Amino acid sequence: MKPSEVSNEIRVAVLGEWVPPQLADVLALQRAEEPEIAAALIGGTADDQPAPQPGDGFDLALSTADRQWPGWVCEALWHDTLSIAVAKRSHLLAYREVPCCEVLKQPLIRAQSTAGEPWRVVAQRVLGDALQDREQLVGSFDIALTLVSAGYGIVIAPSARLAGYLNRGIAARPLAGTPTVVMAYLLHPRARLTEPMVRFIQRV
């Protein structure tokens, strides 16, 4: 796909079930500073709706995974730290940061939809590659956090992913000893970008 040389719209594909909260600030800034160029979001997150691919008519993409598309550049965009989601009555709330040894004593729950996200590799490494055989696998992040709220186990995830669930019967604590993780990537064509696209990327 080649970016349109004359367009009053920037089409941004959002890949995955999670939308980074920072995107709202970027869209608001775009609307305030360049209202004549609209930013349109497209995406496919339902099971029967495939994720957009290069050539599907978008200019830029945001992804939680490091995607390698021919002719596109993938750049780390937003970063975060790993946290533990627990039920609000959990004894783990006594810790300011939850030690890895305590995490491995708990029933662990993982959403299948997060399997390809790069922070999973960091979590595995920090916990000594002990997650693979210990986690109960469920279909979506929403289901995983519902089980956490009910006291069935805990979830490891970036802090920003958990923020929207803190009013749904869960609490979060940082996972001790973890490095910063990449939360989202920006993908753009390797070819020359239009001026509106360049300015949009600068706002990001």
PLM features per residue range, with description:
Residues 1-13, 70-73, 94:
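Short helix-loop hinge/linker segments at domain boundaries
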Residues 33-41, 126-135:
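A local structural motif
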Residues 72-82, 86-108, 198:
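Flexible hinge/capping segments at coil-to-helix
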Residues 73-83, 159-160, 167-183:
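Short beta-strand->loop
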